[in-house]
């Protein structure tokens, strides 16, 4: 007997023993069950990110829980890895909500209202949730502008495109990389 046909027969026999997942009559309750999988999966992803923030950065659990929802939503909106956004926020503000830099950057993502207020749709950049969304929007824009080169985008996020602060940009990229490694190498 050919092994390939033997495996196919085993697979078909296994299918006959498994109860069908899709009901014979598809009613509205089936669709509700299917739609509930997505929010459940999102909650699980947010919880995993929250745990990573606690273990990887030492963030207080309540702060991690709050930020993980915002970060996860921002990552979906702007198609950026949630761990990258979390690393940026960790480096920029250590998840402090109302921090203001000596250069006028505000909030967890350290957004400069003078430069980015209009770009982010005149959101209240002092609101930490809106600040996280705006920071992710800026990073997404910079990634596009840098043609997908994350080092270029992160350096531009920190020091801009022009000027002679390229060494500071390199140090910033190294900090983000260390933070990102801390999150990605966690065993949960």
Positions of predicted regions on the chain:
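Catalytic glycan-binding domains that act on GlcNAc-containing polysaccharides
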Residues: 24-188
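Hydrophobic membrane-insertion alpha-helices, especially the h-region
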Residues: 4-21
């Amino acid at each position: 007997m050919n092994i390939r046909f033997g495996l196919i027969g085993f697979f078909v026999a296994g299918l006959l023993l498994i109860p069908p997942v899709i009901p014979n009559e598809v009613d509205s309750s089936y669709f509700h069950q299917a739609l509930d999988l997505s929010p459940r999966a999102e909650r699980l992803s947010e919880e995993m990110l929250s745990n990573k923030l606690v273990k990887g950065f030492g963030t207080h659990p309540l702060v991690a829980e709050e930020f993980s929802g915002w970060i996860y939503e921002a990552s979906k909106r702007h198609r950026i890895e949630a761990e990258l956004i979390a690393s940026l926020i960790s480096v920029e503000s250590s998840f402090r909500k109302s921090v203001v830099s000596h250069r006028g950057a505000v909030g967890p993502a350290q957004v400069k209202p003078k430069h980015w207020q209009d770009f982010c749709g005149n959101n209240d950049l002092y609101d930490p949730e809106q600040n996280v969304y705006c920071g992710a929007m800026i990073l997404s824009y910079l990634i596009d502008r840098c043609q997908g080169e994350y080092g270029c985008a992160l350096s531009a996020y920190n020091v801009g495109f022009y000027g002679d602060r390229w060494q500071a940009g390199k140090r910033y990229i190294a900090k983000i990389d260390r933070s990102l490694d801390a999150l990605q190498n966690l065993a949960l």
